[in-house]
Amino acid sequence: CIVTTIRFFAILSMDYYILGGIIMLDFSSEVFYRGECFYAYKYFGAHITDGGVMFRVYAPAARRVELIGEFNGWNGENSAMKNDGRGFYELFVPNACEGQMYKYRVYQANGRIVDKADPYAFASELRPGTASIIASLDKFKFTDSKWINSRTKLYDEPFNIYEIHFGSWKMPNGGITEESKPDELWYNYSEIADELIAYVKEHHFTHIEILPLAEHPFDGSWGYQAAGYFSATSRYGKPQDLMEFINKCHNNGIGVIIDFAFVHFVRDDYAMGMFDGTPLYEYPPSDVNQSEWGSYNFNLSKGEVQSFLMSSAAFWLDIYHFDGIRMDAISNAIYWMGNKDRGINDRALDFVRKMNWNLDNTFRNVILIAEDSTDFPNVTRPVEKGGLGFDYKWDLGWMNDTLEYFKLDPFLRQYHHNKINWSMAYFYNERYLLPLSHDEVVHGKATIVNKMWGLYGEKFSQARSLYTYTVSYTHLRAHETDQYLV
């Protein structure tokens, strides 16, 4: 494996892989364990080859791993995977084919036997099922090369983002009901493309930001507790449907950003938690093992976890042609448990810098956005200049102060102008993006209109003033608006 070193970071050279394809010629376990592998999904997972499918999984402490699936009647007795001595198990199955479901039966170090979904699966069974699915990702042919080659980071151009949750932007048959069949609950990725693109263009948005699409078990969530970091949720269709959606967006001049939750993951038994009977992806049992949301915290100090997450971020940009990544809960990576009093998580910060540097230097003008509620400095400063390497940071302070201001009686606002002008005291410290996001309309917080002062009819004029103020804020041209706001 050829490695190019930039200060204390490393990026795998691009000629080491079959780019544009999905199968890796060779693989360096040393690079993987160092946390410098950027394309682990080209090695692990289920890969269709001539005559069958090659399966590989990382489970170093497992006593035995069996491959079970539709191709062997879910009986793994004669399908034990080979341990190659590096912590990797593999098995070639000549009769396996695309579309078949599978799992790994892991004989764990703690004595349990658990059927696990593939952490590197490219597709997943529609919930409530939890199996992985053999999928080919090279069938769809993108026609967006002109867009990809001309996109920029929009530092000096209009940047107006429309944030959506794919499952609730518009739902057929009035939405989710107990009588609905599982495959009738949502529109397909490609089905909704034309209508959504027309809406976005009509309202002069430049980008669509989609709440997390990584496979997740709970319909009622937005997808922030993921189980499949290389698997676009099957709720809205197959991988090719999502590719078609993004391709249509690009050919209509619309960029697409994905929300990426890399700090924590779902605790469900079929997923990555205690994968081989040890805390393989998460921190060992301690006060940092679980997040404030009840999920497992990724152990961002482990090289193999870093390789997993870097590869996931690269996967969405490489395979699906996303134009940017909005990284969730950065404060929980900067500080232990997101608590400034507990100190800085240096290993996690080093990982964030490494991931951002690699993404920025591999994918042409990809946009990296931090959802960060702290005052930690240099979030949007380049890595080579000592920063974290993000292009934009959500200005959550501006959002909170501005919404508080617009709740006030107009007569009383003269005593609270500090809520409007305070953000200018730190405005030039970072490259900020002004968010009016989903976080502000949930858990009884009310819509934007209902946050405004006045009787119901008066609230709409206040909301118009808010949006006008937002888009005219100093010279900044980066804004983010959510589907739920009005």
Where are these regions (language model features)?
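Short proline/glycine-enriched turn/loop motifs at strand-loop junctions of beta-rich domains
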Residues: 58-64
